Amino acid sequence: MITGQIIQTSIDELKAITKVDLGVYDLNGSEVASTMEKDDITTDLITGFAASPADSQVIGVHHLLKIRDEGDLLYVLVARGMTDDVYMAVSYTHLRAHAT
């Protein structure tokens, strides 16, 4: 399984490119890696989305995306913001996840 340090490095690099704050959370809502404050990201937000049938969802300023490995749900990615950059960053991540 991929380590938290690798995930942190990856989202730090993505933030440098996209200027979008990102967070990765496990299925219990615990932060694995983040470039943002967790102030308004609740455990209920993460666990509720993880349990839903949706692969991606926008809730307020949070764009949520399920991260799967060989079909198994492992993490939830959260991108924060309302700009087109956030939508494009999440869309790119979503497309890359389905391409592998």
Report the location of each language-model feature.
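A short beta-strand signature within small-molecule sensing/ligand-binding domains used
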Residues: 57-68, 73-76
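Regulatory loop-to-helix N-cap segments in sensory/regulatory domains
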Residues: 78-90
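Conserved small/polar residues in nucleotide/adenosyl-binding loops
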Residues: 93-100
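Structured interaction and signal-relay segments at domain junctions
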Residues: 1-62
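Surface-exposed beta-strand edges and their flanking turn/coil or helix-capping segments
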Residues: 46-49, 88-92
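Short linear motifs in exposed loops
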Residues: 35, 77-78
